[in-house]
Each structure stands twice: as structure tokens, then as C-alpha cells.
């Protein structure tokens, strides 16, 4: 029986490929019913971390627990098929020579025929696949194939679900729909889920918490709102969205900027070099004379629900993100203030 409160637990997990450290002392927990997004660029170690959790790579250092039980670490190495994990990958990996129903039933060899049929019907119904049960994978759309892969992974009632870039092959509108359906299914089942992705929007849309990974290490783990509003490092700030950056100096517990003074973190001594980073939405249009700075519009783009402007002042160029509206012409002068809620000051590298 699964221990109460236990889902997936990685403790000081490390892994080397030859002389290259791919995963470096990674630790995190995923509770039942929680979706943890493991977010980072290609080659950062996130897929290796998932494979270590699944048992697809032999653990070299650390410990992996599933449902409160050690499945890897020390002398323990439980094979993948006995770890009670479901997995969905980018290519779906459906069996082309058998039907949708048979694909969903693939992992149900240990249950009775009646239970097998019940689970096929349950997951086909939840994912809108009932009418497609007799069909074969080549007869399905990309979204339908993704739903079959998810149904097959969920039918054995896994303790942990592992998703490795599962939506990247879908077009954008369908991708959003399948993401939302997947979250609904995982929450309904109460399954601890690790989602590996390089897409910040996907991680923020689907995850309860996000672990941001770089060069084999976790840089920050927190809620989507918190990692966006209070990034722990410049890498986290840059990876989540576009940033504007200015070199500044700390003086009197603050930094001077073209927009006025902003508070510096208490740990940064006076005279130290610092980096000011702020998101495009930190630039907020104001009337002249209200503590605002004049900027010249270099370029303006309509991007649906918002406008992206490139503006300049004192030889420096910045990106601004404003609500949808008329586009100002190049050369127009606009006045902006800076919202400190979207500003971050870090020690200079």
C-alpha cells in the first residue's frame, strides 16, 4: 500500500556520462495529486532525471523513493516495470499493429478480464476515446494519439506519472487543449506527476510547482507565481521570460537607474556592482511629469492581447509590453515609469 503523503522523492541524485556530470545532487519531492514541472534548456539534465526516476538509467548516487518505498539507491534497484510508474513521451510510442483498446490494455496483464474491460472503458470515457476503441494508431490525429498514450499510462493506476515533453509535436491550439485535459485527468486520479519541459509557458500552465534546472542543478523550486515574481538567479529570470538588463551600482542600499532609485537586496554592500533586470511589463506608460522618463519608440508590434514595443532612452534600448491598443509610430515619444514588482537586482557576475 502507498504510504500516506508519499509520491515521488529524489534525494541527492547525481549521474555522470563519462566525465560529464549530467545531474548534480538533485533533490525534490512530488506529492500525490501534485504536478511538478521540471523546466530547463536542452541538455540541462531534466530528461536524465526523469529516466533515473523511472529506472531507465541505473542510479549512480543518491536515492529514489516512490510511494514512500526505496526503488533505487544503495543495493536497491527495482526494475522499471515494478516501480508503478506511468510514462508518456513526445513520440507517444503507440503499438501500430494493435487497436486503441489493446494499446490502453497493454499494461493490464495482471488484472482480471472484467477489470481490464472496466479500466479500458473508464479511461476511454474520461479522454473521449470510446468511439475510437476499435481504431488503429495510424487512423488517429496527433491529439487522439496523445490521449491514447495518456490512457495507456493511467490505466494501470500508477503511483507516479512521468511526462517527457509529451505535447511538443502538437500544434499550438491543440497543445493547449491537451495540456488542460491532461491536468484534469491527473488531478482527478490524484497522481504524483513529474512533467519535463523546456517550455516556460507549459510549465507555468500545468504545474503546481516548478523546478528550474541548469547544468544539472536545480536553481529554484517554487510556485509558478513565485518563480516569476521572485527569481532566485539571473538564469531563472531570463529563462521564464524576456528581460531588460542594466549594469548598476549599489549606493545607500539602492541602485540608480534611468527611472529613479530602486532598493537593492540587503546582502549587497555599498559600492558593489550589480545587475538590474526587469521584465517588459515593468515599463508602464504614464503621463509626462508624473515621475516618468521619456522614451522614443523604435518599433511596435501587435501580438494579440498585448503590444510589444522597443523603446530607447539615453542610448539604451528596452522592450515594453503593453495591453492591446493602437500602435504608436516609430519616432513617437512615450513616457514610462518602472513598476518595482517586476524588477530584480542581482550581484554582477
Regions found by a protein language model. Name each.
Residues 54:
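Helix-to-loop junction immediately C-terminal to a conserved catalytic motif
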Residues 63-83, 112:
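ABC ATPase NBD Q-loop/coupling interface
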Residues 15, 27-30:
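Conserved A-loop
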Residues 243, 253-349:
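Non-catalytic connector elements of ABC transporters
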Residues 35, 84-86, 90, 94-235:
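ABC ATPase nucleotide-binding domains
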Amino acid at each position: 500500500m502507498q504510504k500516506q503523503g508519499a509520491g515521488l522523492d529524489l534525494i541527492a541524485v547525481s549521474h555522470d556520462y563519462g566525465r560529464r556530470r549530467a545531474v548534480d545532487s538533485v533533490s525534490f519531492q512530488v506529492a500525490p495529486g501534485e504536478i511538478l514541472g521540471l523546466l530547463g534548456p536542452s541538455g540541462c539534465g531534466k530528461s536524465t532525471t526523469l529516466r533515473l526516476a523511472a529506472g531507465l538509467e541505473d542510479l549512480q548516487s543518491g536515492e529514489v523513493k516512490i510511494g514512500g518505498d526505496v526503488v533505487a539507491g544503495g543495493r536497491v534497484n527495482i526494475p522499471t516495470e515494478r516501480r508503478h510508474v506511468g510514462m508518456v513521451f513526445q513520440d507517444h510510442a503507440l503499438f501500430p499493429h494493435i487497436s486503441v483498446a489493446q494499446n490502453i490494455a497493454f499494461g493490464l496483464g495482471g488484472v482480471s478480464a472484467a477489470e481490464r474491460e472496466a479500466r479500458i472503458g473508464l479511461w476511454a470515457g474520461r479522454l473521449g476515446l470510446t468511439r475510437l476503441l476499435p481504431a488503429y494508431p495510424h487512423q488517429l490525429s496527433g491529439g487522439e494519439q496523445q490521449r491514447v498514450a495518456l490512457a495507456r499510462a493511467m490505466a494501470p493506476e500508477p503511483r507516479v506519472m512521468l511526462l517527457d515533453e509529451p505535447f511538443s509535436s502538437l500544434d499550438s491550439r491543440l497543445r493547449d487543449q491537451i495540456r488542460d485535459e491532461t491536468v484534469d485527468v491527473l488531478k482527478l486520479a490524484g497522481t504524483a506527476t513529474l512533467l519535463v519541459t523546456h517550455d516556460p509557458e507549459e510549465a507555468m500552465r500545468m504545474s503546481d510547482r516548478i523546478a528550474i534546472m541548469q547544468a544539472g542543478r536545480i536553481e529554484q523550486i517554487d510556485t509558478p507565481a513565485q518563480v516569476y515574481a521572485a527569481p532566485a538567479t539571473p538564469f531563472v529570470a531570463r529563462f521564464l521570460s524576456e528581460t531588460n538588463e542594466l549594469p548598476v551600482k549599489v549606493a545607500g542600499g539602492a541602485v540608480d537607474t534611468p527611472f529613479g532609485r530602486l532598493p537593492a537586496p540587503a546582502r549587497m554592500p555599498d559600492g558593489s556592482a550589480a545587475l538590474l533586470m526587469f521584465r517588459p511589463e515593468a515599463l508602464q506608460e504614464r503621463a509626462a511629469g508624473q515621475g516618468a522618463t521619456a522614451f522614443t519608440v523604435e518599433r511596435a508590434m501587435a501580438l494579440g492581447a498585448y503590444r510589444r514595443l522597443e523603446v530607447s532612452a539615453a542610448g539604451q534600448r528596452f522592450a515594453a509590453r503593453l495591453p492591446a491598443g493602437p500602435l504608436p509610430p516609430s519616432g513617437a515619444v512615450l513616457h514610462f515609469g518602472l513598476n518595482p514588482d517586476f524588477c530584480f537586482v542581482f550581484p554582477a557576475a
